[in-house]
Amino acid sequence: ADLMIDLEGLGTGPDTTILTIAAQSFDPLGNGYNERFYYARIDLESQEARSIQQDTIDWWATQPAAARDEAFNEADRIPLDQALDELGKIIWQSKRIWAQGPTYDMNILEHAYKSYSKPLPWMFYVVRDSRTVFGLWPELPKPPTSHHALEDCRRQIDMLQLTLRHLNVKELS
C-alpha cells in the first residue's frame, strides 16, 4: 500500500516546529483508504531548536476555530523523536510516499530525522507529489483544506484516486 503524509507546522522552512503529523495508508488505484494510519500531536518543548515564523502564527489566527483547536490542543502530545520512530515503522511498510507538494512535508520530515541523527525511513525514489497529479486535471473539484493533518491526508487521497480514475490510470510505477 501507499502512504499519504501531511503535517501542520509553525512555518514553511525545513526546520519548522511541527504541530501535528499524519499518515494514511491507501491504494492509489482503489477507493478510500485502509485501516492503517498514524496521527500524533507533537510536543512543542521537544522542538526548542526548531523555528517558528511569525507570519505562520498570524496565518493560524485566521483559520477556523476547529483547525486551531486541533493544531494547538495540548492533549496527548508526544516528543518529536518518538513520533519519528513511530511514523518510520509505517513508512518502511509503504510502497510509495505521497505528500501535497514536493517541498513542504517531506523536507520538514527529512530535516527532523536528520536533526536526531536518525536514518530516513524512505528511499528518495518512492516520494510522490499529489499536487502535480491534480494539475493534470484542472477541473478537479477541490474540497476545502481543513488543516487537520489526518483529514487533509484523507481529502488528498480522495482527490488523488478521483484524478487517477479520471485519467484512466491502470498502473503506477
Model-derived segments and spans:
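Short alpha-helical "patches" and their helix-cap loops
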Residues: 37-42, 121-124, 172-173
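Pocket-edge positions in alpha/beta enzyme catalytic cores
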Residues: 72-75, 125, 145-148
